[in-house]
Amino acid sequence: FARMAERLLGYRVFADEAGKMNRSLADTGGGLLLVSQFTLAADTRSGMRPSFTTAAPPEEAERGYNRLVDICRQKHPPGVETGRFGAHMVISLINDGPVTFLLRP
């Protein structure tokens, strides 16, 4: 989880003065929102319904999520906000780009 936290905080996806993706969250001092989303583990290769057999068991996943949150909070003083693990949530955001990356551990 330390490696994932390092990547989340250090991945250069924010524009510098030249408009190039060259600044990290740590560089910008922005906040981090961590929300558990098991649907990202869906296997959509066949059929018309996603399979979640590759997702970690809920208890294991929650421990991992909490560990990642703890590490990010230690390493990112500007702040880390979270959703509630396993809860249905309505999340509002502005995606400037749109730019979305899937970081793998």
Per-range role (PLM):
Residues F1-G29, L40-D70, K75:
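Compact, glycine-rich, soluble single-domain proteins
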Residues M4, V35, V99:
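Residue-level signal for inorganic ion chemistry
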Residues E17-L32, E81-I94:
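Glycine/charge-rich, flexible interdomain linkers and switch-proximal surface loops
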Residues L33-T39:
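Active-site-adjacent structural patch at catalytic or cofactor/ligand-binding sites
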Residues F52-P105:
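Positively charged, low-complexity, intrinsically disordered RNA-binding extensions
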